[in-house]
Each structure stands twice: as structure tokens, then as C-alpha cells.
Amino acid sequence: MTTLTNQKPLGVLFMAYGGPENLGEMPGYLADIRAGRVTSQAILDEITNNYRLIGGKSPLPEFTRAQVEATMEQLASTGRPLKAYIGMRHWSPWIEDAVREMLDDGIEQAIAIVLAPQYSSLSVAKYQKKIKAALEMNHGHIDFAYIDNYHTEPGYITALADRVRIGIQEFPEDERDDVHVILSAHSLPVRIIKEGDPYADQLHETARLVAAQAGLTDEQWSWSYQSAGRSPEPWLGPQLDEHLRDLNEQGIKKVVSIAIGFVSDHVEILFDIDIAAQEVAHELGMTLVRPPALNTDPLFIGTLASVIERKAAEVA
């Protein structure tokens, strides 16, 4: 790795969505996601039950901590003192608290990265706005360098392509030519496309690179969104359950499902794919395989370290 000569500590703020670490935190967590809007008892009960079915908590905070620890280990040889901070958008440890801690520690320069490879005004930009608001609230200044996206990084693409192969290999060798791969990501409102948001384009670029590296033909894979919100406005589709039904009508019975927009296990994988999508597949007589999420995969951790190191060199 490049040796950086500036010895002033450089902060590295890792940001993720956040998630409840027990069922008792669900009301507050949902209230934050819904910006204080009242959550009906029916919705609260439904989502609480979803979390109960995946173990009674979100594994995202734990995986985020592990990802940060592994990334910082790789960055230890950069030559410049680095200090990691974790901030969540919708639950503790809050982004605002992380920024306050950075100010208290005397951090003057920092890198901010969201654990989401594709940029959107409704995702990554929201995290960055929280940083700026926290600085204003605390009347402080930190020179932040933002990593907006890393959706085409070779290590990230290779790690996902490896998961395609892992999923296909779950099927008997004589059936693998019949396996169809679904690549998916969290849906967002359709209006972002009209506003020129790059989210969908970046997802499709990632998907094409993954499919090519995995050696898939155009007929062997397709794209789907998942986990659409509950607002009445149109959301990007098709949704995963609808897509499974469409594939079934085409005679496809063996499927590998990989959520390329998520970098760790959480409810949108463990419930939306492992439970909800599996129920649809079972109903249709399909076999659905979901390979492991990236979590602390060395290739993905190497990707995070690489993009952070490059950004650190820019601000040195």
C-alpha cells in the first residue's frame, strides 16, 4: 500500500442503515425510519414478527462492526494514523453521535463511506447530509472527503461473481445449465429516474459486470428489485415475488437469488429472500438458492480498504 507521510490522524466514518438489536427497539427504530409518522399497530406487529423470524434482531450492526474491524486491519500499513468511527442512519450508534465524537477527538480531516456501493439521492446523499447537519449542530468543522460509490470495483464484482458460482454449484451438475440467476437490489420510488438519479444505472452496470465475470449468458440471468416501501407512489420493479412468478411461467424452476446492493445480512435478505421469496418459490414448485452475503468476504473487505486508501491519498 502507498505510504502516506502526513501523520495527523485521519478519521474514517463508516455509515450503514442501522437496525434494532432486540425487539424492544422496534417502535423507536420504525419511528425514525418513518420520520416520526405514526406506525400502525398492524404494521408494527408485522415487522416485529418478521424480525422475530430472523432471530429477534438485525444482524447488520454486528456485521458492520466486523466489516469495519477487518477493513481497518488492512489499512494498518498505510503509514498515516487512521481512526475508525461507525454511524448509523436510523439507529444507534447515530451518525450525529459519531460526528460529535470525531470533533471531540480533534479530527480535522476524514473520509466518509456508506456501506452501500451504489449512489442515490435517497440513500448515500442522505447519509452525507446527516454529516453536514451534525457539523452545523455542533458548530464544528471537519474536512470530509466523500466516497460516493464503488459499484464497479474489481474486488466487489469478483466477490459477487463468486457467489453466483457458489449458488449454481448447489444444484446437481447435470442441472446447472437450467439454473437462472436473479440479481436484485432494494427498490426506490420511480420518481428518482425522472430526477436523473444514477441509482438504477449503477445497479445495472454492477449486474452486467457480475454476470459477465460469472460467465452467464443473457438468457441465464435477469434483474429484479425487492423490498419496496409501503408508500402509495410507484416503486421500481419488477419486485422479486412478481419476477419469480414470471420466470415460472417461462418454465424456469431452478433459481439463484443474489442481492447485489446489500453488503451484509439483514432483514431484506434474511426475511425478504430467505422466507418471503422462498415461500413463493415453494408455492410455484421452484428451487431457490441464496448464497451467503458479502459480510466480511476478503475480496469485499479489500475493496473497502482500496477505495478508502485511494481517497486518503487525495486528501494527504
UniProtKB/Swiss-Prot annotation:
Keywords, in A-Z order: Cytoplasm, Heme biosynthesis, Iron, Lyase, Metal-binding, Porphyrin biosynthesis
Function: Catalyzes the ferrous insertion into protoporphyrin IX.
The EC number(s) this enzyme carries: 4.98.1.1
Record-linked InterPro entries: Ferrochelatase, Ferrochelatase_AS, Ferrochelatase_C, Ferrochelatase_N
Pfam families: Ferrochelatase
GO biological process: heme biosynthetic process
Catalyzed reactions per annotation: heme b + 2 H(+) = protoporphyrin IX + Fe(2+)
The name this protein goes by in its record: Ferrochelatase
Species: Deinococcus radiodurans (strain ATCC 13939 / DSM 20539 / JCM 16871 / CCUG 27074 / LMG 4051 / NBRC 15346 / NCIMB 9279 / VKM B-1422 / R1)
A single GO cellular-component term on record: cytoplasm
Entry keyword Metal-binding: yes
